[in-house]
Design a protein with these regions (language model features):
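Basic, flexible Lys/Arg- and Gly-enriched helix-loop patches that mediate nucleic-acid binding at interfaces
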Residues: 1-159
């Protein structure tokens, strides 16, 4: 648990998996749902999280206000989030207030700040893939599974 008593992803694991030193490869903000990769390989985690390797992280999000094609263009080109211009990204509009964004960096509250830069607000955010591995749609929130052989191969090809 965290200092404020909140449950962490490690708290959700069986005791035998906690003992082998698993840790999250990256993080999700408190109100963000979705895919978290757990590993006990520090070199792999460092590689996947290093901005120079441009590992893709894909998020589904919903906004308070409709998203325009101008918003999409601005987000894709990079926006100022407090003195930092975000790297180019991909945005797929899938509804008036719904989209999927693919980032290759992971600044603190980045998507929320990016949407604020185009005068909008994130009301729901979920990571749906990391390093070309997609969230298993059959998993319930708070549950986990081992990677498949093909998913391990994806990571080995990158690493």
């Amino acid at each position: 648990a965290t200092e404020d008593g909140d449950t962490t992803v490690i708290d959700l694991l069986p005791q035998e998996l906690r003992r082998i030193g698993l840790f999250p490869c990256g993080r999700l903000d408190k109100n963000t749902h979705g895919f978290v990769l757990l590993t006990n390989n520090g070199e792999l985690a460092h590689f996947l999280l290093s901005p120079k390797h441009h590992v893709k992280k894909k998020y589904y999000f919903e906004t308070k206000f409709p998203l325009s094609s101008e918003d999409k263009t601005a987000l894709e080109g990079g926006v100022d989030i407090g003195g930092y211009i975000t790297a180019p990204c991909e945005v797929e509009l899938i509804g008036e207030k719904k989209a999927v964004i693919t980032l290759t960096e992971g600044k603190y509250h980045q998507i929320k700040l990016m949407l604020a830069a185009v005068h909008n607000q994130v009301i729901y955010l979920k990571r749906i893939s990391f390093a070309e591995i997609s969230l298993d749609s059959t998993l319930e929130e708070g549950s986990w599974r081992y990677l498949s052989d093909s998913e391990i191969e994806i990571l080995e090809r990158r690493f």
